[in-house]
From Swiss-Prot:
Disulphide bonds in the chain: none
Subcellular location: Cytoplasm
Source organism of the structure: Rhodopseudomonas palustris (strain BisA53)
MF GO annotations: ATP binding; serine-tRNA ligase activity
Function: Catalyzes the attachment of serine to tRNA(Ser). Is also able to aminoacylate tRNA(Sec) with serine, to form the misacylated tRNA L-seryl-tRNA(Sec), which will be further converted into selenocysteinyl-tRNA(Sec).
Protein name per UniProt: Serine--tRNA ligase
């Protein structure tokens, strides 16, 4: 969320940064919404002040035995009592309109972020290692896994539908080993505190990290009541004329008013609604919501290994085979809470932590600095780590395995997460998040990079302590 005061103070600078994302200038419209809100607040405050003054004057008029004035003042107070609720509602409506507008626009890119329209504008920052050489044509992970009898997409589809997988035997253990290895390095060597967070969160938590309201269609929602409301609204649309006629005939209220009420009810935020987390970033970052931290405690570094759930609404037709794009996957998340002065250095540190676990697995990768047109909604700057997968496409391909982003105070404002420095004044913290890394994609990378000509998978040295003596995953 952006600070409307900063936008009002320097709209040109805001629009200059905002339009770098390929979006139209928006500062003027935001300022107009803010002006409407401020006018509504002034009108409400003036009415309240006049009511207080008139109430005091009534006593003075009665004391002076000026009954005519007292009665006139009482009539004025009565009228103010009647009009003030509408003024208060106007304030709420104007405030909600501004908040909605601010909540739906992305963060501003830092000045050093490269300009670009999409992924083609991303810039290679560095490489590690080189692609492995094979005396045979490398196969994709799903062919290897199915041939081993340890990766079952058909069974998963029967119980859950498309974009799910059942892992068995050595591959199931290998995935568990990868996640455990990542956690051990991040907690034992990189200074992160392990957290076991909830997988179900409320609207406010998803709003805080900016998954809501803009990306609701990409999430899995768990709310029977909401589903019933949506279904009822769809039925309402199908039989709209009959229902509106019934409402008018029943005399409940005008058809137009009733329709608006139904629309509002169907989409009103529900405090009882829950969402499956798309990433542990949501749970970890929200640990500091509505709090004031001592800056001596910062940076705060948190990590979690959790299942993640994504609807992949915009991924139709992409990566339909294999484990690359699943509705459910496992990921180790890294989150840092810092001061504004620390956040840039912390971003570099987080990237190094994510790189380290891939280096120890002996995986070739490259680091990309994302351009303005490819960054996430809440990000000021993002590094992507793309690991080499020799079984992808024709001759192999780089695939994203980690994104490390600095968000500035964008999420902190949505969560009201602040810190108190030496001067004692609260200020918004900065938040960072990154994958450390995606366990499912790391599994794919290990399978494809460590495949052998007979279809077996050699276990990387770093994972041997977690595999119970299993050095090669073969068809048993």
């Amino acid at each position: 969320m952006h600070d409307i005061k900063s936008i009002r103070d320097n709209p040109q600078a805001f629009d200059a940064a905002f339009t770098r994302r390929g979006l139209a200038p928006i500062a003027d419209s935001l300022i107009k919404l803010d002006e409407t809100r401020r006018i509504a607040i002034i009108a409400s405050e003036q009415a309240q002040a006049r009511r207080n003054a008139a109430s005091k004057e009534i006593g003075e008029a009665k004391k002076a035995k000026d009954n005519a004035r007292a009665e006139a003042l009482m009539a004025e107070v009565t009228e103010l009592k009647t009009t003030m609720p509408a003024l208060d509602e106007a304030v709420k409506a104007a405030d909600a309109a501004l908040k909605k507008a601010l909540s739906e626009i992305p963060n501003l890119p830092l000045a050093e972020v490269p300009q670009g329209a999409d992924e083609h504008g991303n810039v290679v920052r560095s490489h590690f290692g080189a692609p492995r050489s094979y005396a045979f044509t490398p196969k994709p992970h799903y062919e290897l896994g199915e041939a081993l009898g340890q990766m079952d997409f058909e069974a998963a589809a029967k119980m859950s539908g498309a974009r799910f997988v059942v892992l068995k035997k050595g591959l199931a253990r290998l995935e568990r080993a990868i996640g455990q290895f990542f956690l051990d390095v991040h907690t034992g060597e990189h200074g992160y505190t392990e957290v076991n967070p909830p997988l179900l969160v409320k609207d406010d938590a998803m709003f805080g990290t900016a998954q809501l309201p803009k990306f609701s269609n990409d999430q899995f929602r768990v709310d029977t009541e909401e589903i019933q409301i949506k279904s009822a609204y769809e039925e309402f649309e199908k039989a709209k004329n009959a229902i509106l006629n019934y409402v008018e005939e029943a005399g409940i209220k005008s058809a137009r008013e009733e329709k608006l009420e139904v629309l509002g009810f169907a989409y009103e935020p529900n405090p009882d609604r829950r969402w499956l987390i798309p990433t542990a970033e949501v749970s970890l970052t929200n640990l500091v919501r509505e709090s004031i931290l001592d800056e001596k405690e910062l940076p705060m570094r948190l990590t979690a290994l959790t299942p993640c759930f994504r609807a992949e609404a915009g991924a139709a037709g992409r990566d339909t085979r294999g484990m690359i794009r699943q509705h459910q996957f496992t990921k180790v998340e890294l989150v840092s809470i810092t001061t504004p002065e620390q956040s840039k250095d912390e971003h570099e540190r987080m990237l190094a932590c994510a790189e380290e676990v891939l280096r120890r697995l002996g995986l070739h990768y490259r680091v990309m600095t994302l351009c303005t047109g490819d960054m996430g909604f809440a990000s000021q700057k993002t590094y992507d780590i793309e690991v080499w997968m020799p079984g992808q496409g024709e001759g192999g391909a780089y695939r994203e395995i980690s994104s490390c982003s600095v968000c500035g105070d964008f999420q902190a404002r949505r969560m009201d997460a602040r810190s108190r420095g030496p001067d004692g004044k609260p200020r918004f913290v900065h938040t960072l998040n990154g994958s450390g890394t995606a366990v499912g994609r790391a599994l794919i990378a290990v399978i494809e990079n460590y495949q052998q000509e007979d279809g077996s998978i050699a276990v990387p040295d770093a994972l041997l302590p977690y595999m119970g003596g299993l050095k090669v995953i073969a068809n048993s």
